[in-house]
């Protein structure tokens, strides 16, 4: 993934963009990951490896998934849960619909 974004950052630079965010695109439809448990593990692995993308010199943005299949009626707990994993991986910008919950979680962790 880092190789791909390295090439994209070079292209952006040639087009005049000096700074932006690296966004691996989590939270969107995965046609190749239909099994929700496999998809969620892939997303968590990507969150935990955000620090590798930060080495490219741009901050990392991650969209936090709902994971309805796993969280069911407690779906509003999913994004705060994933925010912990993303924070541990070094995510800089968290895309969330649960701003107060995620903010409280990150403040409690003392990382942001």
Feature locations, PLM:
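Active-site-adjacent loop and "lid" segments of alpha/beta metabolic enzymes
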Residues: 1-10, 14, 27-112
């Amino acid at each position: 993934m880092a190789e791909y974004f390295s090439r994209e950052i070079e292209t952006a630079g040639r087009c005049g963009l000096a700074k932006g965010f690296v966004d691996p695109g989590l939270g969107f439809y995965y046609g190749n990951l239909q099994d929700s448990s496999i998809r969620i593990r892939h997303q968590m692995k990507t969150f935990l490896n955000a620090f590798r993308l930060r080495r490219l010199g741009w901050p990392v943005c991650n969209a936090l998934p709902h994971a309805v299949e796993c969280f069911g009626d407690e779906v509003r707990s999913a994004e705060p849960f994933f925010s912990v994993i993303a924070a541990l991986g070094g995510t800089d910008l968290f895309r969330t619909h649960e701003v107060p919950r995620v903010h409280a979680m990150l403040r409690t962790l003392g990382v942001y």
